[in-house]
Protein backbone atom coordinates (compact mmCIF):
# COMPACT_ATOMS: atom_id res chain seq x y z
CA UNK A 1 0.00 0.00 0.00
CA UNK A 2 3.03 2.29 0.45
CA UNK A 3 3.12 3.68 -3.08
CA UNK A 4 -0.60 4.34 -2.93
CA UNK A 5 -0.13 6.41 0.23
CA UNK A 6 2.45 8.54 -1.55
CA UNK A 7 0.12 9.09 -4.51
CA UNK A 8 -2.87 9.93 -2.35
CA UNK A 9 -0.87 12.20 -0.05
CA UNK A 10 0.31 14.13 -3.08
CA UNK A 11 -3.28 14.90 -4.04
CA UNK A 12 -4.09 16.12 -0.54
CA UNK A 13 -1.00 18.32 -0.47
CA UNK A 14 -2.44 20.32 -3.35
CA UNK A 15 -5.49 21.11 -1.22
CA UNK A 16 -3.56 21.94 1.95
CA UNK A 17 -3.37 25.71 1.58
CA UNK A 18 -5.70 27.62 3.85
CA UNK A 19 -5.81 25.12 6.72
CA UNK A 20 -5.30 26.44 10.24
CA UNK A 21 -1.78 26.42 11.65
CA UNK A 22 -2.46 26.79 15.39
CA UNK A 23 -1.14 24.22 17.81
CA UNK A 24 -3.86 21.73 18.65
CA UNK A 25 -4.30 20.17 22.07
CA UNK A 26 -4.07 16.59 23.23
CA UNK A 27 -6.66 14.60 25.17
CA UNK A 28 -6.34 11.64 27.50
CA UNK A 29 -9.58 9.94 26.52
CA UNK A 30 -12.52 10.09 24.13
CA UNK A 31 -14.61 11.54 26.96
CA UNK A 32 -12.50 14.72 26.85
CA UNK A 33 -12.81 15.36 23.11
CA UNK A 34 -14.69 18.52 22.05
CA UNK A 35 -17.70 17.83 19.84
CA UNK A 36 -20.08 20.18 18.08
CA UNK A 37 -22.72 20.40 15.39
CA UNK A 38 -21.63 22.46 12.40
CA UNK A 39 -23.42 25.45 10.96
CA UNK A 40 -24.80 23.28 8.17
CA UNK A 41 -26.87 21.48 10.79
CA UNK A 42 -25.65 18.00 9.80
CA UNK A 43 -21.87 17.78 10.23
CA UNK A 44 -20.69 16.61 13.65
CA UNK A 45 -17.08 17.51 14.45
CA UNK A 46 -15.08 15.66 17.09
CA UNK A 47 -11.67 16.89 18.19
CA UNK A 48 -9.68 20.10 18.42
CA UNK A 49 -10.89 22.58 15.78
CA UNK A 50 -7.28 23.76 15.37
CA UNK A 51 -6.08 20.35 14.14
CA UNK A 52 -4.20 20.59 10.84
CA UNK A 53 -5.91 17.56 9.30
CA UNK A 54 -9.67 17.15 8.93
CA UNK A 55 -11.07 13.71 8.13
CA UNK A 56 -14.72 13.83 7.08
CA UNK A 57 -16.40 10.44 7.26
CA UNK A 58 -19.64 9.39 5.58
CA UNK A 59 -21.14 6.42 7.40
CA UNK A 60 -24.34 4.42 7.81
CA UNK A 61 -24.56 2.81 11.26
CA UNK A 62 -25.85 -0.45 9.73
CA UNK A 63 -22.99 -0.66 7.21
CA UNK A 64 -20.74 -3.65 8.00
CA UNK A 65 -17.79 -2.12 6.14
CA UNK A 66 -18.12 0.98 8.34
CA UNK A 67 -17.97 -1.33 11.35
CA UNK A 68 -14.85 -2.98 9.93
CA UNK A 69 -13.23 0.43 9.47
CA UNK A 70 -14.17 1.62 12.95
CA UNK A 71 -13.26 -1.54 14.87
CA UNK A 72 -10.47 -3.37 13.05
CA UNK A 73 -9.45 -1.00 10.25
CA UNK A 74 -8.00 2.49 10.47
CA UNK A 75 -10.72 3.81 12.78
CA UNK A 76 -8.73 3.26 15.99
CA UNK A 77 -5.73 5.00 14.41
CA UNK A 78 -7.89 7.97 13.42
CA UNK A 79 -9.22 8.06 16.98
CA UNK A 80 -5.65 8.15 18.30
CA UNK A 81 -4.75 10.98 15.91
CA UNK A 82 -7.83 12.87 17.10
CA UNK A 83 -6.80 12.38 20.73
CA UNK A 84 -3.30 13.61 19.90
CA UNK A 85 -4.76 16.71 18.24
CA UNK A 86 -3.14 16.00 14.89
CA UNK A 87 -6.54 15.43 13.26
CA UNK A 88 -10.17 16.18 13.87
CA UNK A 89 -12.96 13.92 12.68
CA UNK A 90 -16.22 15.01 11.06
CA UNK A 91 -19.24 12.82 10.48
CA UNK A 92 -22.14 12.88 8.06
CA UNK A 93 -24.53 10.11 9.07
CA UNK A 94 -26.52 8.42 6.32
CA UNK A 95 -29.51 6.11 6.75
CA UNK A 96 -30.06 4.72 3.24
CA UNK A 97 -29.66 1.10 4.35
CA UNK A 98 -33.08 1.18 5.98
CA UNK A 99 -34.66 1.54 2.55
CA UNK A 100 -32.27 -0.95 0.98
CA UNK A 101 -32.59 -3.84 3.45
CA UNK A 102 -35.71 -2.83 5.38
CA UNK A 103 -36.42 -1.48 8.82
CA UNK A 104 -35.58 1.75 10.63
CA UNK A 105 -32.41 0.92 12.56
CA UNK A 106 -30.14 3.36 10.74
CA UNK A 107 -32.54 6.24 11.29
CA UNK A 108 -33.01 5.34 14.95
CA UNK A 109 -29.25 5.09 15.50
CA UNK A 110 -28.62 8.47 13.86
CA UNK A 111 -31.38 10.03 15.97
CA UNK A 112 -29.86 8.51 19.12
CA UNK A 113 -26.40 9.81 18.22
CA UNK A 114 -27.82 13.29 17.74
CA UNK A 115 -29.39 13.01 21.19
CA UNK A 116 -26.03 11.90 22.58
CA UNK A 117 -24.42 14.99 21.04
CA UNK A 118 -26.74 17.13 23.16
CA UNK A 119 -25.24 15.44 26.21
CA UNK A 120 -21.64 15.79 24.97
CA UNK A 121 -21.42 12.01 24.55
CA UNK A 122 -21.46 11.59 20.76
CA UNK A 123 -17.95 10.15 20.36
CA UNK A 124 -18.34 7.71 23.25
CA UNK A 125 -21.73 6.48 22.07
CA UNK A 126 -20.54 6.25 18.46
CA UNK A 127 -17.85 3.82 19.62
CA UNK A 128 -20.33 1.73 21.59
CA UNK A 129 -22.79 1.49 18.69
CA UNK A 130 -20.17 0.15 16.29
CA UNK A 131 -18.76 -2.23 18.89
CA UNK A 132 -22.25 -3.74 19.19
CA UNK A 133 -23.48 -3.41 15.59
CA UNK A 134 -26.20 -5.95 14.70
CA UNK A 135 -26.03 -7.89 11.44
CA UNK A 136 -26.85 -5.62 8.50
CA UNK A 137 -29.97 -7.56 7.52
CA UNK A 138 -31.24 -7.56 11.11
CA UNK A 139 -33.06 -4.37 12.07
CA UNK A 140 -31.35 -4.50 15.44
CA UNK A 141 -31.02 -0.86 16.44
CA UNK A 142 -34.34 -0.77 18.26
CA UNK A 143 -35.22 1.81 20.89
CA UNK A 144 -34.67 -0.76 23.62
CA UNK A 145 -31.27 -1.82 22.27
CA UNK A 146 -30.11 1.77 21.75
CA UNK A 147 -31.05 2.63 25.32
CA UNK A 148 -29.36 -0.51 26.61
CA UNK A 149 -26.15 0.44 24.81
CA UNK A 150 -26.42 4.01 26.10
CA UNK A 151 -26.13 2.53 29.57
CA UNK A 152 -22.50 1.72 28.73
CA UNK A 153 -21.72 5.45 28.42
CA UNK A 154 -21.44 7.06 31.82
CA UNK A 155 -23.86 9.95 32.26
CA UNK A 156 -25.74 9.49 28.99
CA UNK A 157 -28.98 7.91 30.18
CA UNK A 158 -31.54 10.33 31.55
CA UNK A 159 -35.13 11.48 30.94
CA UNK A 160 -34.24 13.85 28.08
CA UNK A 161 -32.01 11.40 26.23
CA UNK A 162 -34.38 8.47 26.72
CA UNK A 163 -37.36 10.49 25.53
CA UNK A 164 -35.43 11.73 22.47
CA UNK A 165 -34.65 8.14 21.51
CA UNK A 166 -38.19 6.86 22.00
CA UNK A 167 -39.90 9.77 20.20
CA UNK A 168 -37.38 10.21 17.33
CA UNK A 169 -36.95 13.80 18.50
CA UNK A 170 -34.25 14.49 15.91
CA UNK A 171 -36.10 13.10 12.91
CA UNK A 172 -35.38 16.33 11.03
CA UNK A 173 -31.66 15.89 11.61
CA UNK A 174 -31.86 12.32 10.33
CA UNK A 175 -33.55 13.44 7.11
CA UNK A 176 -31.19 16.38 6.59
CA UNK A 177 -28.14 14.20 7.20
CA UNK A 178 -29.26 11.70 4.58
CA UNK A 179 -29.78 14.54 2.09
CA UNK A 180 -26.30 15.90 2.89
CA UNK A 181 -24.89 12.44 2.22
CA UNK A 182 -26.66 12.29 -1.15
CA UNK A 183 -25.42 15.77 -2.10
CA UNK A 184 -21.86 14.72 -1.27
CA UNK A 185 -22.02 12.25 -4.14
CA UNK A 186 -22.44 15.03 -6.69
CA UNK A 187 -23.86 14.46 -10.19
CA UNK A 188 -21.84 11.27 -10.64
CA UNK A 189 -23.24 9.63 -7.50
CA UNK A 190 -26.65 11.21 -6.79
CA UNK A 191 -27.48 8.55 -4.18
CA UNK A 192 -24.33 9.34 -2.20
CA UNK A 193 -20.64 8.43 -2.36
CA UNK A 194 -20.96 5.08 -0.56
CA UNK A 195 -20.01 4.14 2.97
CA UNK A 196 -17.54 4.44 4.39
CA UNK A 197 -16.14 7.38 2.45
CA UNK A 198 -13.32 9.50 3.85
CA UNK A 199 -12.55 13.05 2.73
CA UNK A 200 -9.21 14.37 3.98
CA UNK A 201 -8.75 18.15 4.01
CA UNK A 202 -11.46 18.45 1.39
CA UNK A 203 -10.15 15.74 -0.95
CA UNK A 204 -11.94 12.36 -1.12
CA UNK A 205 -9.84 9.23 -0.93
CA UNK A 206 -10.39 7.66 -4.38
CA UNK A 207 -12.35 4.43 -4.42
CA UNK A 208 -9.38 2.54 -5.85
CA UNK A 209 -7.37 3.45 -2.73
CA UNK A 210 -10.10 2.63 -0.20
CA UNK A 211 -7.95 -0.22 1.10
CA UNK A 212 -6.12 2.47 3.09
CA UNK A 213 -9.21 2.69 5.30
CA UNK A 214 -8.57 -0.86 6.47
CA UNK A 215 -4.83 -0.42 7.01
CA UNK A 216 -4.09 1.52 10.18
CA UNK A 217 -0.39 2.00 9.46
CA UNK A 218 -1.02 3.25 5.92
CA UNK A 219 -3.81 5.57 7.08
CA UNK A 220 -1.59 7.01 9.82
CA UNK A 221 1.16 7.57 7.24
CA UNK A 222 -1.35 9.39 5.05
CA UNK A 223 -2.49 11.64 7.91
CA UNK A 224 1.12 12.45 8.82
CA UNK A 225 1.97 13.25 5.19
CA UNK A 226 -1.04 15.52 4.84
CA UNK A 227 -0.23 17.21 8.15
CA UNK A 228 3.34 17.94 7.04
CA UNK A 229 2.13 19.30 3.70
CA UNK A 230 -0.45 21.49 5.42
CA UNK A 231 2.10 22.87 7.85
CA UNK A 232 4.51 23.54 4.99
CA UNK A 233 1.84 25.49 3.10
CA UNK A 234 0.98 27.44 6.25
CA UNK A 235 4.64 28.38 6.77
CA UNK A 236 4.90 29.57 3.16
CA UNK A 237 1.96 31.92 3.60
Whereabouts are the PLM-identified features?
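Structural alpha/beta surface segment adjacent to cysteine/selenocysteine redox centers
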Residues: 67-144
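Sec-exported extracytoplasmic/periplasmic mature domains
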Residues: 68-71, 82-83, 114-121, 127-135, ...
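A structure-centric signal for secondary-structure junctions around beta-strands
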Residues: 52, 109, 192-195
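Active-site-proximal beta-strand/loop segments in catalytic clefts of secreted hydrolases
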Residues: 58-60, 92-95, 127-130, 166, ...
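C-terminal cap of thioredoxin/glutaredoxin-like
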Residues: 21-25, 152-237
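Flexible, glycine-rich surface segments
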Residues: 146-148
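Extracytoplasmic thiol/disulfide redox context detector
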Residues: 1-101, 225-237
Amino acid sequence: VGWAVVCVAGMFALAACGQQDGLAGTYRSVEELPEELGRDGTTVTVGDPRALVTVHLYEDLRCPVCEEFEISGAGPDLREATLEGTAKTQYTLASFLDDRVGGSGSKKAVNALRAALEEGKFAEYHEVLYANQPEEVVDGYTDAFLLELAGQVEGLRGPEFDDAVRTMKYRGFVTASQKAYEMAGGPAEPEGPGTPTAVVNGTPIPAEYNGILMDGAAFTELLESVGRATLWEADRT
